[in-house]
């Protein structure tokens, strides 16, 4: 059943697609140094870790779970990596329009923030899976999360 389209509250971060070229769309506090990025999918969620100082990210794997089981597995990754903040890829149509998965990813971002009490930043993830496959990724979801995090790190 399609999700009803409702006005969204102010996003946790202005998606990069809304920023002018060269514009820093958000202020990220200097104490936020390590990040865990998530490429949300209905059945699989890729994740990557990175740090601000080196502006590098590394794919780490994919969580194949839904609902509460997904959050249990994310909690394990948070315990292992201890990031200062999370970055969530939010999909849009090529023209920048939102669709059902945009709403799902934003809901996922809000759930992460509510459950784990960490800052959560949204990043436009258009074409990240295509780029991941183009890089020859064996785990396209984890590589897409890595690309999302690389984009975020370049923007701050």
UniProtKB/Swiss-Prot annotation:
EC number, UniProt record: 3.1.-.-
Which InterPro entries has this protein been placed in?
RNaseH-like_sf, YqgF, YqgF/RNaseH-like_dom, YqgF/RNaseH-like_dom_sf
Subcellular location, principal: cytoplasm
Give yes or no: UniProt keyword Zinc-finger.
Answer: no
Q: Give the highest taxon in the source lineage.
A: Bacteria
Q: Where in the cell is it found?
A: Cytoplasm
One biological process term from GO is: rRNA 5'-end processing
Q: Which GO terms describe its cellular component?
A: cytosol
By its UniProt entry, which SUPFAM superfamilies does this protein fall under? Ribonuclease H-like
A GO MF label: nuclease activity
UniProtKB keywords: Cytoplasm, Hydrolase, Nuclease, Ribosome biogenesis
Task: State the PANTHER family in the record.
Answer: POLYNUCLEOTIDYL TRANSFERASE, RIBONUCLEASE H-LIKE SUPERFAMILY PROTEIN
Q: What does this protein do?
A: Could be a nuclease involved in processing of the 5'-end of pre-16S rRNA.
**UniProt record similarity statement:** Belongs to the YqgF nuclease family.
Q: What is this protein called?
A: Putative pre-16S rRNA nuclease
